[in-house]
Amino acid sequence: MSKKGFTLIELLIVVVIIGILAAIAIPKFANTKQKAYITAMKSDLRNLVTAEEAYFADSNAYTATVTNLKFQSTTSVSTPAITTGTGAWYATVSHSQVTTPASCGVGINTTNPVVAGASEGEPVCQ
């Protein structure tokens, strides 16, 4: 009579291999949600830049009021805190699920409120 099937040792080896692969893969995907939240904040700021520039093209001034821009933030991203000056503005946002970085910011014709050396119009998080 011939026996068919796997031995206990073979099954244990397979379980150990799966465990090793899981130990490698899980840390790689652990901060995926965090990256998605940060991307949502940056995307909102890019959309805000477009809305502010469109408003500026129509009225020759920037606005600190989000309702004037007809701008809607992504879910869980705070309403942008916009500060305007003469021909310049900057804004910051935060996300309710993100603790680090605390906020993201963008500036036009002024220093970025989050990272001083950032490129103009480029959202940066810190």
Pin down the residues of each PLM region:
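N-terminal single-pass transmembrane signal-anchor helix
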Residues: 1-29
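Conserved short hydrophobic patches within well-ordered secondary structure
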Residues: 16, 38, 90-91
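Aliphatic-rich helix starts adjacent to a transmembrane/signal segment
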Residues: 28-45
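Periplasmic/extracellular, small/polar-rich flexible segments of pilin-like filament-forming proteins
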Residues: 46, 50-126
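Conserved catalytic core of two-component sensor histidine kinases
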Residues: 15, 42, 49
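Conserved alpha-helical elements of the SDR catalytic core
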Residues: 25, 32, 52
